[in-house]
């Protein structure tokens, strides 16, 4: 009789396990998870993203994502730790910590690859304490960062001697190293004056969020003909050491930054050297990183 009783108990346990496994399989097959992120704590060293995963239904399993690493352009830029899914819970929360310095290094690699790279998440975890989960997810990323300066135009101004007009700044990436990112530009100039303008110097600055992020200089002297056009070649160096502060400030301001471009030409007019400050260009740069991230993860 005792053997029969034990058999019935084992049969009930087996039935429960079977039903649980069947429900778990059905749940996982029909699962439509949604991931939502929002900005958390931000400073010049780290950026925190509060991440919530909604499963749409209670999960009959206890899952612990021990660590999920975020890679950009092959460089680890952040880690999501201790994302736990409780038994029969329909959501889970965690914090993704991004390292600003590593983000800048990944940006350099992204540019080296022609502004093409992959964003990848590598995760490992356990179910009911058993470390059996391991997987990855990646999405391609393409940008066109130089378009922000390549299409810059500045009208001529002044009375007796007018400042040259800028009719574009086609640019390309140059040297990229630990000291910064180099941008090489061809400044298209038009001289509206009846006399030629020998150009022997350019002061070129880009400020963002109150920080000087880049400055440029003339590579070689050029003469802009009277009532004609010419091209001035300039080299701009982006200070990557300051970028973590700019990134943090941009996020703190709701992903909104004021960017100012200042350009002064050093020319010679009637054998007299003089500087010609051009009108400043101010632009508001807005991003929607969180929105794009949520769309990519949903």
Predicted regions and their residues:
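Extracellular/lumenal and peripheral-membrane lipid-interaction modules
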Residues: 2-298
């Amino acid at each position: 009789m005792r053997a029969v009783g034990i058999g019935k108990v084992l049969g009930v346990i087996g039935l429960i396990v079977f039903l649980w496994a069947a429900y778990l399989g059905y749940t996982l097959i029909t699962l439509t998870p949604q991931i939502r992120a929002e900005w958390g704590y931000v400073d010049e060293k780290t950026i925190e993203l509060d991440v919530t995963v909604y499963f749409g239904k209670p999960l009959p399993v206890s899952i612990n994502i021990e660590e999920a690493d975020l890679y950009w352009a092959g460089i680890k830029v952040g880690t999501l730790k201790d994302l736990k899914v409780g038994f029969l819970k329909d959501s889970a929360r965690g914090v993704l910590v991004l390292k600003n310095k590593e983000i800048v290094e990944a940006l350099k690699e992204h540019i080296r690859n022609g502004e093409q790279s992959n964003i990848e998440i590598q995760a490992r975890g356990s179910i009911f304490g058993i470390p059996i989960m391991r997987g990855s997810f990646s999405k391609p990323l393409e940008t066109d960062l130089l378009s922000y300066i390549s299409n810059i135009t500045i009208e001529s101004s002044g009375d007796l001697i007018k400042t040259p007009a800028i009719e574009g700044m086609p640019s390309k990436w140059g040297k990229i190293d630990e000291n910064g990112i180099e941008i090489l530009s061809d400044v298209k100039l038009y001289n509206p004056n009846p006399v030629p303008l020998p150009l022997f110097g350019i002061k070129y600055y880009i400020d963002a969020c109150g920080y000087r992020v880049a400055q440029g200089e003339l590579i070689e002297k050029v003469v802009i003909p009277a009532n004609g056009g010419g091209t001035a070649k300039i080299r701009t160096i982006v200070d990557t050491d300051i970028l973590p502060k700019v990134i943090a400030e941009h996020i703190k301001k709701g992903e909104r930054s004021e960017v100012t471009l200042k350009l002064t030409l050093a020319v010679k007019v009637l054998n007299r050297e003089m500087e010609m400050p051009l009108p400043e260009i101010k632009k508001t740069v807005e991003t929607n990183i969180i929105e794009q991230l949520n769309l990519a993860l949903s």
